[in-house]
From Swiss-Prot:
Designated name of the protein: Guanine nucleotide exchange factor SRM1
RCC1 repeat copies, ranges: 45-101, 103-152, 183-238, 239-291, 292-347, 349-411, 412-466
Bias (Polar residues) ranges: 1-11
Role noted for this protein: Guanine nucleotide exchange factor that promotes the exchange of GSP1/GSP2-bound GDP by GTP and controls RNA metabolism and transport. Involved in yeast pheromone response pathway and in mRNA metabolism. Involved in nuclear pore complex (NPC) assembly and required for mRNA and ribosome nuclear export. Binds chromatin and is involved NPC-mediated transcriptional control.
Post-translational modification: Phosphorylated; possibly by KSP1.
Organism field: Saccharomyces cerevisiae (strain ATCC 204508 / S288c)
Record-level Gene Ontology MF annotations: guanyl-nucleotide exchange factor activity
GO BP field: cell division; nucleus organization; poly(A)+ mRNA export from nucleus; protein import into nucleus; regulation of mitotic cell cycle; regulation of mitotic spindle assembly; response to pheromone; ribosomal subunit export from nucleus
Amino acid sequence: MVKRTVATNGDASGAHRAKKMSKTHASHIINAQEDYKHMYLSVQPLDIFCWGTGSMCELGLGPLAKNKEVKRPRLNPFLPRDEAKIISFAVGGMHTLALDEESNVWSWGCNDVGALGRDTSNAKEQLKDMDADDSSDDEDGDLNELESTPAKIPRESFPPLAEGHKVVQLAATDNMSCALFSNGEVYAWGTFRCNEGILGFYQDKIKIQKTPWKVPTFSKYNIVQLAPGKDHILFLDEEGMVFAWGNGQQNQLGRKVMERFRLKTLDPRPFGLRHVKYIASGENHCFALTKDNKLVSWGLNQFGQCGVSEDVEDGALVTKPKRLALPDNVVIRSIAAGEHHSLILSQDGDLYSCGRLDMFEVGIPKDNLPEYTYKDVHGKARAVPLPTKLNNVPKFKSVAAGSHHSVAVAQNGIAYSWGFGETYAVGLGPFEDDTEVPTRIKNTATQDHNIILVGCGGQFSVSGGVKLSDEDAEKRADEMDD
């Protein structure tokens, strides 16, 4: 069902088309090879909040049927800050991974193909009486107890921990999971899907991997960053070489894959992109920033989500890494992307977006669209195909993208959301309408928190924050009222 983004640390240092953007200089970014840990790890334990639709146990709020829909952020009672001590998490399409201070990996959500990395087959499931007055198709019983409740993956599943190495990043796609260790090793579990169903996990040898497994390809490389998509994942090594693994039917692996050779993609391999210092993935498209400060993208581009051209057409592909244009002197902080939209956050807190408009994915008001907005044959605005700065919004420090919604954290620690609203993943309450522009998430649970990390799945969202002192909370509230 869709994209996920790793949580990013907000505290880390035929149709009408208009004129083309002027040529600009390349952007810059923090050196991921030096500072990548800071992007994904909080310096202190977090309260964890979850919201949206959790019919596949995505919310991690326990097995009761009432937890299938949560319309505003809710504190996760199974991850108390002073006990669980969660410092990071990664959100997949229908599951979430979390990391605690001791490098234990927690998981919850859908485990149909082993994405949780632990056995949930003996869970108790209690179904409601289907003749009961309150029964319905949507709430016909409780959830799988072991999938809907956060739990640790057995520590012995990760041999590097016994050698003193720590987990420095987690990553989750729709159907698989990864853990990156401080020694550059990668452990993975789950599987990859393609248009026809399950593609497989590793070569033609493993179809589904239900427990963490050391990826042998990286025994001779030191991996420093992971970038998960829907059914693919990118890896960056310390020399700046990018590897790709998984489904490549939309060119997301950076190379053309012949149908008869598609199992060849089930082994991580480089595809010629080198001298890179930062990587990011959407569901079926990708980004990389080179060491000479060129931001490039590739993959599926039918709504301009790659941000490289005004040409928008159904099934369009960017077949090899192509450079994006951004305003002069932009320093990139992070990139998040969903199925058909992309978000680029600058170190100054400015947010640029490109991609689909139908569900307000880009967060740009329809009465202020740029002149290069793509319109269909009926004159309806459908996409913004080039990175465009969002105006009249706060300065942000962190951003995450789900399939068709996004969450961003302002520099004062308050979360904002926009996009597809029917699944309540925007966290704005009982309203099911799509949200046009970044809108403050207001609720009692998070009103006194400094939100640090955010992540988005297919139909849900997760955030992590630290409670402010009474004085700081009051000060922020006064500033917001001004």
